[in-house]
Amino acid sequence: MEEQIEPIDRVFVQLGPIAIYWYAVLILLGVAVGYFMARRESVKRGLPQETFADLLVWALPISILSARAYYVIFRWEQFADNPISVFYLREGGIAIHGALIGAVVTAIVFAKKRGLSFWKLADVAAPSILIGQAIGRWGNFVNQEVYGAEVTREFLEGMFLPDWIINQMYINGTYYQPTFLYESLWNVLGVVVLLLLRKANLRQGELFLSYVIWYSVGRFVIEGMRLDYLLIGDSLRTAQLLSIILVVAAIALWVYRRLWVKPPRYLNPDAATKQRK
């Protein structure tokens, strides 16, 4: 007989006719935690206190739009019969890579207009981005998405997971691997690594490039476990291809900047407005 396990209610709170969903709450929580981390570090690095608040005003909506656009482009068959569903964000369906593209483009334009170094902003933000991603993945958990292969309950219990996680991995009569959790934990570990690298006083830009490499390696591996993924054509997983490109590009940029640009050190108090390119 099939087990009867009720999933977590996707609605965080109902305010009259307005429903606020866990998905949105957890994404905004990740943004808030990341913002306060970046704000605290930016002041230490000699940036104006309002820098990241001003950046967030533009980066947040643009990132959400680009994340949704990225997802829709690679999953158009899901929306073709009902195009208005493109705007149903409460049901999930945004791509982190799309959000990062939007955020980076916004930060480049913002830095240029403010006379700041993009690389300095990116270095300050790197651990904050990862912690935001780690928290945001729990929105996928509530929505019962970003999961891996079929497993047994015994398999999940063997991972010493609490029942509330195991039960949420019970989807349409089957238990699945919690790949959302793997990525969330990988990102938390990445935050620790980046905070340690911050003390190593790398060259400007190298902390952000470390983030790109760390996240991309983890995403490549975990993407191979997922059952819900975006494809280019019939078999090429979009996130894995982009992860390879990002790792190669980050390493190439690291070498190029170290050998020819020779940017200042991250902890150099005068570096905030230098090396704008």
Curated annotation (Swiss-Prot):
Record keywords: Cell membrane, Membrane, Transferase, Transmembrane, Transmembrane helix
Top-level lineage group: Bacteria
EC number: 2.5.1.145
Cysteines engaged in disulfide bonds, as pairs: none
Topology within the bilayer: Multi-pass membrane protein
Pfam families named among the record's database cross-references: LGT
One Gene Ontology molecular-function label: phosphatidylglycerol-prolipoprotein diacylglyceryl transferase activity
Record GO biological process: lipoprotein biosynthetic process
Family, similarity comment: Belongs to the Lgt family.
Protein name per the record: Phosphatidylglycerol--prolipoprotein diacylglyceryl transferase
Species classification: Bacteria, Bacillati, Bacillota, Bacilli, Bacillales
